[in-house]
UniProtKB/Swiss-Prot annotation:
Belongs to the eIF-2B alpha/beta/delta subunits family. MtnA subfamily. The record marks C165 as: Transition state stabilizer. Substrate binds at R58, G59, A60, R101, Q204, N255, K256. Pathway: Amino-acid biosynthesis; L-methionine biosynthesis via salvage pathway; L-methionine from S-methyl-5-thio-alpha-D-ribose 1-phosphate: step 1/6. The lineage of its organism: Bacteria, Pseudomonadati, Pseudomonadota, Gammaproteobacteria, Lysobacterales. InterPro entries: IF-2B-related, IF-M1Pi, IF_2B-like_C, Initiation_fac_2B_a/b/d, M1Pi_N, NagB/RpiA_transferase-like. Keywords: Amino-acid biosynthesis, Isomerase, Methionine biosynthesis. This is Methylthioribose-1-phosphate isomerase. GO terms for biological process: L-methionine salvage from methylthioadenosine.
Amino acid sequence: MNDSAHIDYARYDHIRPLLWTGDALELLDQRKLPFEVAHVRCDSSDAVAEAIHSLAVRGAPAIGIAAGWGVVLAARDIAADDGSAALQKLEPALLRLNAARPTAVNLAWALMRMRRVLGAAGADWREVIAREAQAIADEDLAANRHMGALGAALIAPGSGVLTHCNTGSLATAGFGTALGVIRAGMAQQRIAKVFAGETRPWLQGARLTVWELHQDGIDATLIADSAASHLMKSGLVQWVIVGADRICANGDTANKIGTYQLAIAARHHGVKFMVVAPSSTVDMATASGDQIEIEQRDPGELFGVGGVRTVADGIHAWNPVFDVTPGDLIDAIVTERGVIAQPDLARMQAAFGS
């Protein structure tokens, strides 16, 4: 069986959702996939904030990376003698970037990193923040590849897996979190079958995940979100593998809406449940999922598909885009720092501090 050192990254890691050109941030427009490969060029921090809010770029790690480059773009509009002075002038732009998606902790984490290096920088503060933005991206890619190996090692050869939303290269600097585990598991011949839920209402599973896997030559089977419990009952999957937008001190995990019901069904059917996310997603300052702000998006997103209305006029809709899975329904949280089995407050504190 191949180990992680023998993963063919040229095959399994060639999609990139973000490209810093030196002049602008170019984003692969994920709203148009899979039928059109187009890019959004962001020349300002406000353009980056709008791209994050409108889901042109999405996925917790990817929006954190985008925000870092957004700070670099905002710096072009100000003059300052040192980083501390620059930080005061940049704070409004940082606040606008942070408000673009409130649930994902990576966004606030990346902006805090930029604040920290700015506050300590001297006259070379522009170079300092550019290096930090690049470091955020580079560290994410390295973390994803390491998490892929750690997560794959938990999976018995011949297993079937189910994933939700999109947690691949499109959601990160590359390779992916949960999808990185799946890529590594396929390369190591541990995973025999991959299923992906469609993930209403934005269909990230149908539009993005199966498209990504197809690019890698991985045969993935798409299911309706409502078919997941029946799939688990059939015995075709042994693991549900998902990403995260925020992981609390007690292991409670916010992720794409529909994750919670997958965890409930998995526990009922004896299917293991794995969360894969970089340590930047861990928020030890938030005690439990009850304290997480859940983003509510336009109810109109539920009224149709692809711009075609499927719901009668006058209908109301409720559209939370994340839910919280209790830590006691999670078998393993995988980060680049290691695997936390049966996460709870004590195990999370041992791994990440208090």
